[in-house]
Amino acid sequence: MATPIKVGIVGYGFSTKCFHLPFILPNPELHVHAFLQRAPAPDPASPSDAPGWGHCTVDFPGAKHYRTPEEFFSDGEIELVVVCTPSHEEFVERALEAGKHVVVEKPFVNTSAAADRLIALAKEKGKVLTVFHNRRFDSDFRTLEHLVNSGALGDIRDAQLHFDFPSPSWVSGWTRKEYQPGEGMAFGLGTHTVDQALRLFGTPASVTGFLRSNRGVDSDVDDTFTIVMQYAGEKRNLLVTVKTAIVTPLQDQLKFFVRGTGGSYVKFGSCPQEARAIASPGQPATDPDFGAEDPRIWGTLSTTGEFDAASQTLDAASGLHVGKYPSLPGWYRGYYENVADAVRGRAEVCVRAETARDGLRVIELARESHVRGCTMPWS
């Protein structure tokens, strides 16, 4: 086997430990080589003194530990940098300037203009630049994408993509009145669902946004949003709605409600991978059932013609073939499998930085629409 790609990770907190390392470590083509963590290493005799989410020297004693960006980006052995810090733009730029390939957590950066600049730099340097939109590898979205691409639903006319989250604890810290680019739920959970919409349907002709603060404070920083994407040409009859609500008293949250000329798909409940990764102790991503959904939350597929005889029966009243359609397994490991292939030149990167940039632009236009009270043309 070829020499593994040496990975350097910027940051050592929740994101690194729960969303990246569990899916990097099982990949034999990736080797965790170094960390940039500003905190000093704890005394080996007192590893419990490590800060917050721990310290890389305790968990990865064989990896290099750098405390300054200058040292980290000067390591010529690092091929791939994974940026997991709250702020991204500076580290992405420094990684590209140092000749590294880059994976950056979502949201890509705070503005589409900054994204354009980094995309141009990556092209200039001839390096892979991709954004961690792992939700493309959710069980529910993989299933929806399969149904759409296979034609099971016919021509899609209405698609609602949700990422609802009842009373999330983290929004309690959003107390400032004024909005700054990159803040709010649309730039948080919304970047995932907007990315899913772009993956399925491409860029819209126009965007309309409705932003709300439902956490009990007077703030322009949204915790609830609805983004409506309208299309043109052959897709002029398509309406796509992307939503997040925090007031949502449901046992299982609505994920997808998609209707087309050939059928519909309604899905409640979420992909189990995140919950299993962040549990203590977490379930290893290598477990065969790591991405398997509970059949109780499989989505309901209704089609005008029989699509899957094993899961559908004919409903005499409606004339539709209806049944619980088995969800494909979630596969977050697929994200880093694709990254390794792209770095080695065997494949195109799945999550293109240009698509992530378009997602930022959708959110920018949604906010402009909300402020101005009108629909904004794509630009």
Please name every model-derived segment:
Residues 1-60:
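N-terminal Rossmann-like dinucleotide-binding module
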Residues 4, 29, 36, 80-82, ...:
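C-terminal helix-rich "cap/oligomerization" subdomain common to oxidoreductases
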Residues 15, 45-48, 252, 323-336:
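Active-site loop of classical SDR/Rossmann-like NAD(P)-dependent oxidoreductases
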Residues 62-63, 98-100, 125-127, 234-238:
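A short helix->loop->beta-strand "cap" motif at the edges of active sites that frequently abuts
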Residues 79-80, 86-136, 151:
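Beta-strand-loop-alpha-helix segment that lines the small-molecule cofactor/substrate pocket
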Residues 135-219, 373:
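Predominantly a Rossmann-like dinucleotide-binding segment in NAD(P)-dependent oxidoreductases
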Residues 188, 194-286, 333-347, 364-365, ...:
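Contiguous beta-strand/loop segments that form the cofactor/metal-binding neighborhood of enzyme cores
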